[in-house]
Amino acid sequence: MNHGGNTQAVAPMDPNSIENRYGVDGSQTQKYSYQYSTGSESAPWTGHSVENQAVENGNYSNSNYYHPQPTGPATGNVQEIPNTVSFTISSTSGTANVAQDYSGYTPYQTSSDPHNYSNTGYSNYYSGYQQQPSQSYPQPVGAYQNTGAPQPLSSFQNPGSYAGTPSYSGTYYNPADYQTAGGYQSTNYNNQTAGSYPSTNYSNQTPASNQGNYTDYTSNPYQNYTPDAANTHSSTIATTPPVHYQQNYQQWTEYYSQTEVPCAPGTEKLSTPTTSAYSQSFPVPGVTSEMPASNSQPAPSYVQPWRPETDSSHPPSQQPGAAVSTSNDTYWMHQAPSLQAHHPVPPQNNYQSPLETKPLYETPFQGHQRATYPQEMNSQSSFHQAPLGYRQPTQTAPLVDSQRVSKVQIPTNPRIASNLPSGFTKMDKDSTAASAAQAPAYVSVSMPKPKDHTTAMSDPGTFPKSLRGFVERAFARCKDDKEKESCEVALRKIVKKAKEDNTLYTRDWDTEPLSTVTTTNVTNSESSSAQLSSLQNKSPTRRPKSRWEPLVEGKPFVKPASTFSSAVKFGVWNHQNENNKKSSESFQKVDAATGFKPTYSGQNSAKKSFQRPVKRQRFSGGAATAIDDEASSDSDKDLTPYYSSAMALAGSAEEKKRRDSRSKRFEKIQGHSRGNDLTKPKNANVGNLHSRRATALRLSKVFDESGSRAVEDIDWDALTVKGTCQEIEKRYLRLTSAPDPATVRPEDVLEKALIMVQDSQKNYLFKCDQLKSIRQDLTVQRIHNHLTAKVYETHARLALEAGDLPEYNQCLSQLKTLYAEGVEGCSLEFAAYSLLYITLHSNNNRELLSSMSRLSEEDKKDEAVRHALSVRAAVTSGNYVMFFRLYKTAPNMNSCLMDLYVEKMRYKAVNFMSRSCRPTIPVSYIVQVLGFTGAASEGTDEKETDGMEDCLEWLKTHGANIITDSNGDMLLDTKATSTSLFMPEPEDAVAHGDRNLDVNDFFTRT
Amino acid sequence: MAYVSMGEAHRRITEYLNRFCDAVSYQDSSTLCRLLSFSSNSPPLLSLADALNVFQDSSSLIRQSDRFSEYGEILAHVFRSLQSYRVGNLVEAYLAFDKFANAFVQEFRNWESAWALEALYVVCYEIRVLAEKADKDLTSNGKSPEKLKAAGSLLMKVFGVLAGKGPKRVGALYVTCQLFKTYFKLGTVNLCRSVIRSIETARIFDFEEFPRRDKVTYMYYTGRLEVFNENFPAADTKLSYALQNCNPKRERNIRMILKYLVPVKLSLGIIPKDELLRNYNLHEYTKIVQALRKGDLRLLRHALQEHEDRFLRSGVYLVLEKLELQVYQRLMKKIYINQKLSDPARAHQLKLEGIAKALRWLDMDMDLDEVECIMTILIYKNLVKGYLAHKSKVVVLSKQDPFPKLNGKPVSS
């Protein structure tokens, strides 16, 4: 029911995207919406989360963070608290949201993640979310509040974006009611998407306008967005009444009213908020004080949340445009620019809310804020402490505050942290890596509102404060939802235009007449802008989600009906997203504990998703992420239907397996989709949005089709990546998700890269890294030809040269299969290596026999093979003289493999000699026989003496007894030596087996 | 394929069903064996297969009577397997037989006495043989052979059924031997270790209690494993046990054992009589034995080269290669004896130069360094007693027993 209601509601809200998504399945719709939203929605989620957070903050942060938003969030939180009764459901929805957030996060990653988390938390608020959120939230709140207070005003200006957030909140509500957070989410997504993740919302709702809005949003929304998050929270609260949700959806279009409505229900009655509340809240957001008011009434708070979301979404969208794409980084970045502060705040809020949320929320905003502030402070600190887990959430919060940002991962909420830790760490890294982009964002964030302005200015993603104020004002003028809607549309257009004119930052928004909002009321324009922003945000988010989503798809979501269903969904999301065990675990936990645990899982998944995105970003940069987002959104859509079932099955190992396989499949598909997306410009956000949507649609279709197909039936050939990267140098990074064609080099470039490596004068570590990346690209593109063989041969030789046996073994095993496939290469050379390796290092008789029996008469005529066979004979008989002669005449790299046996052979030889010879052996003889003169030596005197020194040194370290005769010649006293000889422990033994590889090189490399 | 009328087909199938059920109810193991032994290609089974191809709905016949349907699952799989086997679809035959074997083992588990042990042996044997054939088919079709591996895990399961305290435990060694055959064929001999451990350490098993033929097979395979490990004394013990206990009329089996026992004995310094090699057609060792007797290094190398493939495949190449040191020892002994004849006073001083010359006569071109190296090894390994005076390039032999015989002890490492 709820789902259906949600979907329906959503449809109205976002006719295009939402309807599509929702329209697909009543129950599934939610899922779909999730999925979609994941791509784009994910952003929304983030937005939601942000909103939620904001809401939470709202109470606290509203003033602090985006004052408007915070209030919204605060209310949201408050509402949620009231909703607690429904919590189970809401919690589930919360989880779902979280999951979505995650996916969404990918784009906005960090920020969105946090948001998501916070969102989850919000949704949880209903049930247990608050707790979870509280953890993270508190932190964010603290930060947010700080920033928020200043920003809020500015953010208020952004009301439009907030409007977007309301939709998010709506989603939240839906989840709460539905438990099918999905439905809510979808709605939210639409709204959110519109606001934050342009993709979803935009695609459906106001694609074109969204873009415009986006820009606008970016400027304003960011700040506002945080409030949106708050709204989301409120919306979650709203969850109680499904009807509200529907309203919300509808309202979503009119964000305010809708959001408010949900919020009201969710939050408690807070403000019957719906439209009026929203509108109120929006204005309120502008003023922190208002926020409190809104807090008292959920509706207002919701409105604020929306704004925050928009803000967040905007920043994300803008940022996404930038290379920051990396999920976490991007998120951070995005948030950082516009919403950064807001987003982060929302998470904080969420976290806080869990902790204190209820009380705080319930209490007037101001009061809440106070309470939250402390919490925030705590949370911040906690964030810092446990940055890893919470960082993602926090990161969003951090975005808000530069400090927070720096701390980004501060969000160490124990629960979240536990789940997220790994991700957070990564996040941290990412954040650091992203530092350039993120740092600014963070700074801005830290500077609460003022910073926002600055950030907005500095960062294209962020909107100027003045613009936010303008939007807020416009929204404030809206009398009802419809007005807001129209106002939003108008605002979007304005912002878009401004963006196109490059006057976004130069125009004096403070003096801009609200009449410019034209057609509809200012409010409408604002709302539209919010949608846009949300859409922008969503698009990036969605992609990340989609990646995860594929996994989710695997799980059936048939069971959403149960109270936990929403949680289940969330869990499912997590599962899907993560494919990770954690998600499943979390699900189980959720089931048991209901809301809270699910949320956590959601958070975890979100974190995970973030992490992955981050990695990607590293690889491919912004464009790649965008593509990913799209793909993810698609997958999310597909997944939604499965959620319920997935929930049910999540626990079982079988399901896990299936999920894994599915996730793999999805990854591939995603990769494929990315391939399609390649043409899309990475940086052009607006352009990207459209293209993304298109791709998303395509992808979704693909997914729908593929969903019904068995993995075995998938035409992998059609999914094989075709690289487009023209960079010759590329660092190796282990893929954690489907490869991005934009970062994969095609064959001709790889050929150049190989030549570059071969000619390079740099050290082995560099070459190894480069070759590994070449190998990866070859593998990803399924290239099996002479080039592949050449690359592996080159690498194997280099590895031999450097004594890197593990790497050599990898290459050799690949080469064996390549040669077996008939690929031409230096098969005999490597047959010789293989023989030597077995003889000298593995000492396995059966293996040696079988590899010898594989050699044909023809093979044995090859010089290298013949040499290797002779070496083998010398070694098995212990003929050290022969061994060292062969060592000097070794062809190819045979001597490199022999190198590694020289020590043993010498020891053996001296042992033989000292036992058999009496009374003495001249050291000079040992020098000569045991190859101390060096393989290349021509027997010159200088080298001779060098060899003598080396030999003496060697003998001494092995306990030999040296005496000097009357002529001054050094002699080995064999009798004494025979009992004192020992094999010293290798002093310079290193784990990687080669002392030539400086440990510090390894560290610098990583 | 001879034409079979529907009625005839019906009759044959019913007859088979009757015989199967009779065999089970009267616990007639030998009849049951005949009914299941596909690879025997016995006429009754072939005609039954033809009948099954004519009369497709054999399952209805099974269902007809309660008597048959009690073993309906077993019989249905047998029929399907036999049918596929008859038309040459070995992979299908294997799959059906695998199902049958599982059902049969399940049934066997429920029978308290071990009356059907022989029938179980047949099943184990058939599944392994069928899997090998199916793998051959798969390989020729370019697919990866995996049936033998699957058969291995089924056999392992059977082993688990038999490894208990009851009377069935005497069957465990047969299954173990089938497992050995499977693993040796697959080249995964390391998997043998777990089975060996349970046979040799589990208290429920008394090795002497097992049937002799299984004990011989078991010793043969474990002896081969010891050859791989170059643990010659242990290999000698096991293979000798197998040789002593195997049916003297089974010359093929004796030859298989000797193929490993001869190299093992050689490396322990025990040289077989030429008749033995002749009687059991072990001519590939003839030259090697000669080389050892004569100290003819060149002959040894030629012999190794001549049969390299065979030795590599059977896994004795490395063992035979190591005989080189014994050949050197023999050569030194000959030089020493020679020298003793010409110059008894300095007979115990072998000049490296002289050794190098002797080697050159054998077409082994070595310089003094290499000769010295070999002498140090010989002395180190205690094949020559004495010491090497590096300065004067002379090997000073011990006055007492300068060339100790191995006498069943391996060359020290």
From Swiss-Prot, chain A:
Keyword Plastid appears in the UniProt entry: no
Cited PANTHER family: 80 KDA MCM3-ASSOCIATED PROTEIN (PTHR12436), LEUKOCYTE RECEPTOR CLUSTER MEMBER 8 (PTHR12436:SF4)
GO aspect biological process, one term: alternative mRNA splicing, via spliceosome
Designated gene of the protein: SAC3A
Domain PCI: 804-978
Compositionally biased region (Basic and acidic residues): 653-680
Keywords: Nucleus
InterPro entries: PCI_dom, SAC3/GANP/THP3, SAC3/GANP/THP3_conserved
SUPFAM superfamilies documented for this protein: Metalloproteases ('zincins'), catalytic domain (SSF55486)
Disordered, as annotated region: 1-75, 106-162, 183-239, 266-326, 516-550, 595-638, 650-690
Annotated protein name in UniProt: SAC3 family protein A
Summary of the knockout phenotype: No visible phenotype. Sac3a, sac3b and sac3c triple mutants show no visible phenotype.
Compositionally biased spans, kind Polar residues: 26-75, 106-115, 144-162, 269-282, 313-326
Organism the protein comes from: Arabidopsis thaliana (Mouse-ear cress)
Pfam families: SAC3_GANP
Curated annotation (Swiss-Prot), chain B:
Any GO BP: ethylene-activated signaling pathway
Occurrences of domain PCI (ranges): 216-402
Keywords in alphabetical order: Nucleus
Tissue expr: Expressed at low levels in roots, leaves, stems and shoots. Detected in seedlings, roots, leaves and anthers.
Effect of G152E: In eer5-1; enhanced ethylene response
Database matches in PROSITE patterns: PCI
Subcellular location: Nucleus
GO CC terms, sorted: nucleus
Superkingdom of the source species: Eukaryota
Phenotype of the disrupted gene, per the record: No visible phenotype, when grown in absence of ethylene. Extreme ethylene responsivness, when treated with saturating ethylene concentrations. Curly leaf.
Primary location group: nucleus
UniProt-recorded Gene Ontology molecular function terms: double-stranded DNA binding; RNA binding
Annotated protein name in UniProt: Enhanced ethylene response protein 5
